[in-house]
């Protein structure tokens, strides 16, 4: 490279900017690749736009924008110097003290075993004229000061990825209890000694809780692995209703573990010192003698013994490197994302859409490619498939690699992709653990939105579901079709093959709990896959079905079949369910999934000769002056049996009052309960509860239900507030017509996010209306010119499949635990466990959560 002259620097001085507080500085990662300052060519940061580029892509940015001046960062690793106290360059990692990631005392994902030397230069394109950071002294003051201030500001600024990580996940953020300032404490309490405590109902001397109302000392809950207590403290709450308890042994002058049984969470008690003094406990003199709940949970998170089967931990695995075997770094509870994208980019359609067309996508990228969906997905696919980042961890300065690094690669860190895919989403924008199935559908939805007028790889998953409802009183039927991407397979636990062993285990477990002994070895239910398939296709009774033939309620049966078979069949095992107390739980079940699968028997037949359809008649409506009780004016848009699909009046038929009341009594908002019954088509309490649990974190969860063609609550008319033009433009840019954009916005009170969701869920109706417009006089050419969609495209073929991938979950809930995936490549199974990519020896095909089957060519 030639040396940078004063004249050259003066020529670009006006374009050099000093980053301000609101600027995003991308100095950790290339916008088009996963190159970093540690890559061989370093990273070039534009000193005007603050975008970062690897050596391969910096000229692309220069040619597109004309920006010439860049800050070149190059970092090289060297081993940490020996610690004088330990005599090693690898000092012991600090034990985490908080159940958190990326905060003081939490799990430190960035802790490395090496230090970095940094080389900083200013480079001017296209001739790559350069000057070192410390070589600016000979320049005129005005030039030196301007360049130096920009360089120092760039180096000291928080990078865009760092700002994203500042949203650190912290499992310890606790709220002040609603009982803290109004807690009732009984008179004349017993004095609590400073030590020597024992449960008043058993012999437990640890995991003890002091009830802050009556001073009872009782043991805590039993944990899922059999450790913990005997549940006496929570049983006492159920008997008395006394809500707050403090864990003995955790009381210090700084605080203690306080649990609210009423709020079902760890809480803060600002009046704790006062509450403890009621029992003669001086908080300032207490010392910690027991583990806090956080420490216990951290211990469980660090123990992976129960996960050995899925991670194949007990078997030496051969690490794999090269194209298609690239690991993905865990960005803090991002294993759900890692597993899903590994599977998607093993499918040829996604490779063709994003990787094969990489150059075209990059060429058409906007000025800021970090905010472009197609660019970031293409970048991710190339990073996974190119092999450029699938190399062993670099050797240290002495030429050796530590043993545990031999099977680990640097892999890629998809920070930009994660930030973009989660932007605006209440869950995926956080660093909390998520459900892989929900993320899969979210990603599918994002792909759908960005492929309106181009090749859509989602077609490999898309299929039509045929639902047949038969009124038992009249024998008349109704057929409907809907689009889906996942086959959700129920688990009939009563079909377990080892019922006797399960009953014996439950009896041994009960005895062990009574006698305070260790729990017996776990016995896992073994359910045949054929039983799951039978349960999926079995008729389902629908009570209180509104029969349009009778114009009255009746009993019906519903059967579900495939109207088409997709190229790739995605099967979700419904392991996560609810107990009788509506508490989420995970079924510990083993299902031997077949390598070869034939579901031809589930092909739908449509209306058969001799079958008579139910009349297409709207049910009676509730008028404003009729009593509505707790229901309001809400109905079901999907089933003609409940209401008309098109609303022209402000009223709609009632929903199942008993289900709504049942949900409200559980503490859920009335409007959310109405929506739950509405969107599940009066299918009963369980279906409505499942909807509630899966939508609790939606920003509009408790907002009133607004039906298409009706005004929102409190508004006079949707037309009174015309849709904003920028929202219309945004929807039109996604490939929809202006009429469709206006209709969607009016149906959702001009909410852009909800309008996009609405338009996708009503695409069939919109297409039908577009076709009607053509038949009423509009020319086909006019229709094509407005890019009217032609409806969801589905592929169909034989129902024979072969297993090619599955995602497994470890843990008791989708909100915690860990995900890995197994993919069959080049005739062998491969396990992808974040950065570790290895040949699989014993793929646990019976313990998966989501399975991916590929159609077998006939």
From Swiss-Prot:
Outcome, altering residue 221 to A: Loss of polyubiquitin hydrolysis. Loss of ubiquitin binding
Start and end residues of each UBA domain: 654-695, 722-762
Chain sites annotated for binding Zn(2+): 199, 202, 219, 232
Domain of life per record: Eukaryota
Annotated GO MF terms: cysteine-type deubiquitinase activity; cysteine-type endopeptidase activity; deubiquitinase activity; ubiquitin binding; zinc ion binding
Subcellular location: Cytoplasm; Cytoplasm, Stress granule; Nucleus
Record bears the keyword Hydrolase: yes
Impact when changing residue 335 to S: Loss of activity
Keywords: Acetylation, Cytoplasm, Disulfide bond, Hydrolase, Isopeptide bond, Metal-binding, Nucleus, Phosphoprotein, Protease, Repeat, Thiol protease, Ubl conjugation, Ubl conjugation pathway, Zinc, Zinc-finger
Modified residues (Phosphothreonine): 292, 623
Major subcellular location class: cytoplasm
Active site per UniProt: 335, 818
N-acetylalanine modifications at: 2
Example of a GO cellular component annotation carried by this entry: presynapse
Modification note: Ubiquitinated by SMURF1; leading to proteasomal degradation. SUMOylated at Lys-113; SUMOylation affects the interaction with Cav3.2 channels.
Domain notes: The UBP-type zinc finger domain interacts selectively with an unmodified C-terminus of the proximal ubiquitin. Both UBA domains are involved in polyubiquitin recognition.
Family per record: Belongs to the peptidase C19 family.
Protein name as catalogued: Ubiquitin carboxyl-terminal hydrolase 5
Organism: Homo sapiens
Gene expressing this chain: USP5
């Amino acid at each position: 490279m030639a040396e940078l002259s004063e004249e050259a620097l003066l020529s670009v001085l006006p374009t050099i900017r000093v980053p301000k507080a609101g600027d995003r500085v991308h100095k950790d990662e290339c916008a088009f690749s996963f190159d970093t300052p540690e890559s061989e060519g370093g990273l070039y940061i534009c000193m005007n736009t603050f975008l970062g580029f690897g050596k391969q892509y910096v000229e692309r940015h220069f040619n597109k924008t004309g920006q010439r001046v860049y800050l070149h960062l190059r970092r090289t690793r060297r081993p940490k110097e020996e610690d004088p106290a330990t005599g090693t360059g690898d000092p012991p990692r600090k034990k985490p003290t908080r159940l958190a990631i990326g905060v003081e005392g939490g799990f430190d994902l960035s802790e490395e075993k090496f230090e970095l030397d940094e080389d900083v230069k200013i480079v001017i394109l296209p001739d790559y004229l350069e000057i070192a950071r410390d070589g600016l002294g000979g320049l005129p003051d005005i030039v030196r000061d301007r360049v130096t201030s920009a360089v120092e500001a760039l180096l000291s600024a928080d990078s865009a990825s760092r700002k994203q990580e500042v949203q650190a996940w912290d499992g310890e953020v606790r709220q002040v209890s609603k009982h803290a300032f109004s807690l009732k404490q009984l008179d004349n309490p017993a004095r609590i000694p400073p030590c020597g405590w024992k449960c008043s109902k058993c012999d437990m001397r640890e995991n003890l809780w002091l009830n802050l109302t009556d001073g009872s000392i009782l043991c805590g809950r039993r944990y899922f692995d059999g450790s913990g207590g005997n549940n006496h403290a929570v049983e006492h709450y159920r008997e008395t209703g006394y809500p707050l308890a403090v864990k003995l042994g955790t009381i210090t002058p700084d605080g203690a573990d306080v649990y609210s049984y009423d709020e079902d969470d760890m809480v803060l008690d600002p009046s704790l010192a006062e509450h403890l003094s009621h029992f003669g406990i001086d908080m300032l003199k207490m010392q910690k003698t027991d583990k806090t709940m956080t420490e216990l949970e951290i211990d469980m998170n660090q123990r992976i013994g129960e996960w050995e089967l899925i991670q194949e931990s007990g078997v030496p695995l051969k690490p794999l490197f090269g194209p298609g075997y690239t690991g993905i770094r865990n960005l803090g509870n991002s294993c759900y994302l890692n597993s899903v994208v590994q599977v998607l980019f093993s499918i040829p359609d996604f490779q063709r859409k994003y990787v094969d067309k990489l150059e075209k996508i990059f060429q058409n990228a906007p000025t800021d490619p970090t905010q472009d969906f197609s660019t970031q997905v293409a970048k991710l696919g190339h990073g996974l498939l190119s092999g450029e980042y699938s190399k062993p961890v670099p050797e240290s300065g002495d030429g050796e690699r530590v043993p545990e690094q031999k099977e680990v690669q640097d892999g890629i860190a998809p920070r930009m992709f994660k930030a973009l895919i989660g932007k605006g989403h209440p869950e995926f924008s956080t660093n909390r653990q998520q459900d892989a199935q929900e993320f899969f559908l979210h990603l599918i939805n994002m792909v759908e939105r960005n492929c309106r007028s181009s090749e859509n790889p989602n077609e490999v998953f898309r299929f039509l579901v045929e639902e047949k409802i038969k009124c038992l009183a009249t024998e008349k039927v109704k057929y409907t079709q809907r689009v889906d991407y996942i086959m959700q397979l129920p688990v009939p636990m009563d079909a377990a093959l080892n019922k006797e062993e399960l009953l014996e285990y439950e009896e041994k477990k009960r005895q062990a709990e009574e006698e305070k002994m260790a729990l017996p070895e776990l016995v896992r239910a073994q359910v045949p896959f054929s039983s799951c398939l039978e349960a999926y296709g079995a008729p389902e009774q629908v009570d209180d079905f509104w029969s349009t033939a009778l114009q009255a309620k009746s009993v019906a049966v519903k059967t579900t079949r495939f109207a088409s078979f997709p190229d790739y069949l995605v099967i979700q095992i419904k392991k996560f369910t609810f107990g009788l107390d509506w508490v989420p739980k995970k079924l510990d079940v083993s299902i031997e999934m077949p390598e070869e699968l034939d579901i031809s028997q589930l092909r739908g037949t449509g209306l058969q000769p001799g079958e008579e359809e139910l009349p297409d008649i709207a049910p009676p409506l509730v008028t404003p002056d009729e009593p509505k009780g707790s229901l309001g004016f809400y109905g079901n848009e999907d089933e003609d049996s409940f209401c008309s699909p098109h609303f022209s009046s402000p009223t709609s038929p009632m929903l199942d009052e008993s289900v709504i009341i049942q949900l409200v009594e559980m503490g859920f908002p009335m409007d959310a309960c109405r929506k739950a019954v509405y969107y599940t088509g009066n299918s009963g309490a369980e279906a409505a509860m499942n909807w509630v649990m899966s939508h609790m974190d939606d920003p509009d969860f408790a907002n009133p239900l607004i039906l298409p063609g009706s005004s929102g609550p409190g508004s006079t008319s949707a037309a009174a507030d015309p849709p904003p033009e920028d929202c219309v433009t945004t929807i039109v840019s996604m490939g929809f017509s202006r009429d469709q954009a206006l209709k969607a916005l009016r149906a959702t009170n001009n909410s852009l996010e909800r309008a996009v969701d609405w338009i996708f869920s009503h695409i069939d109706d919109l297409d039908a209306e577009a076709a009607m417009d053509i038949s009423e006089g509009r020319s086909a050419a006019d229709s094509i010119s407005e890019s009217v969609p032609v409806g969801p495209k589905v592929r169909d073929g034989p129902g024979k499949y072969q297993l090619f991938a599955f995602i497994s979950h470890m843990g008791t809930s989708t909100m915690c635990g860990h995900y890995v995936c197994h993919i069959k490549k080049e005739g062998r199974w491969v396990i992808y466990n974040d950065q570790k990519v290895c040949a699989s020896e014993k793929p646990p095909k019976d313990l998966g959560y989501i399975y991916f089957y590929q159609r077998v060519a006939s």
